A protein has these predicted regions:
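Cleavable N-terminal signal peptides
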Residues: 30-32, 42
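Extracytoplasmic substrate-binding proteins
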Residues: 45-48, 54-55, 121-122, 126, ...
Length: 316
């Protein structure tokens, strides 16, 4: 069990400083932070299971939260704890208020010194995004880390609820999670009998990449009545080339690009005039933050995707 109160392991911190992992200014900042927390430790009774299957417990609701990925930032705000966020990372652009919060680096490299000076009492880490060594260093400083990375619809709702538990904002967080579940269930019911549409969803351009059916985006394609042409591949995010897409000849090509208005990835396919998706003008843009971030806004992104597939059905 991990505890969030400022329950500190001083020996671990001193070891980090002495072996160089927390040297220099970071070491000084870390030691100052630790000394400020050397109060009698007690196990907390506010607990939640994270996505690494560890139970994280706090002695009191989190008041100073650091969210170390754009998705984590959105989820904390969705949980009703946006007013507690004291640190984010690059590209944490939603909600707009998050852009005013102090940045502590990016998803792949955290500025630990700056993070420590902000004195978070809870850090939200991204399972496959943040460097594990840095998250372990944060924990060794006595700062609890809650690992998240939703991989399905229920995982998104559950993440919001668990974060709300840790922040003491259950009323708002549970409401958001419930609305998300209900909205996704309504979409699933509406498109349950829809005629299948073959879909290529592009998540990257160089190298060309898609998703399989286990990926959250693949699940959304299926919910909308789409058939993912690469759904049965073993890799979650397979690398491809133009030739395999041409051979599969999807009825729809959907992509998000690198930004909300970047549609360049779709124009690339227009050179292949024999593609069914090109012949029928079924090249669709979906704002990436609405479907490529596992947050409650996925409901809006899925609705857009479903509407695009319905347009494709009407063009047969």
């Amino acid at each position: 069990m991990t505890t969030s109160m400022p329950v500190v392991r001083p020996l671990s911190v001193f070891t980090l400083v002495s072996n160089g992992r927390c040297g220099g200014a970071l070491g000084s900042a870390a030691l100052a932070f630790v000394l400020s927390l050397l109060a009698p430790a007690a196990w907390g009774d506010i607990c939640a299971m994270d996505d690494s299957e560890r139970e994280v417990c706090l002695a009191a609701p989190a008041q100073r939260i650091a969210a170390l990925s754009p998705g984590a930032t959105e989820l904390v705000y969705a949980a009703g704890a946006g007013d507690r966020v004291v640190a984010v990372v690059a590209f944490s652009d939603y909600p707009p208020a998050a852009q005013e919060v102090a940045s502590v680096g990016n998803l792949g490299r955290i500025d630990l010194e700056r993070l420590v000076t902000l004195q978070p009492d809870l850090v939200i880490g991204w399972v496959t995004g943040n460097p594990l060594e840095q998250l372990e260093t944060i924990e060794a400083l006595g700062i609890p880390v809650f690992y998240i990375e939703p991989r399905d619809i229920e995982g998104v709702a559950s993440a919001v609820e668990r974060l709300a538990q840790l922040a003491g904002s259950e009323e708002e967080g549970y409401g958001v999670a419930g609305d998300f579940r209900d909205g996704m269930a309504e979409l699933a019911d509406h498109y349950a009998e829809a005629e299948p549409v073959s879909v290529f969803y592009q998540v990257w351009d160089e190298p060309l990449m898609s998703v399989n059916d286990d990926h959250l985006i693949g699940q959304m394609v299926r919910l909308c009545g789409g058939t993912n042409i690469f759904g049965e591949l073993s890799r979650l995010v397979p690398r491809l080339d133009d030739e395999v897409v041409l051979a599969a000849d999807p009825e729809v090509i959907a992509a998000g690009g690198m930004g909300e208005e970047n549609r360049d990835w779709l124009t690339h396919w227009q050179q292949y005039t024999s593609l069914t998706a090109v012949e029928r003008d079924n090249l669709f843009f979906v704002p990436p933050s609405l479907i490529q971030r596992p947050t409650p806004r996925l409901l809006e992104g899925t609705r857009i995707l479903c509407e695009k597939l319905e347009v494709a059905r009407g063009r047969r």
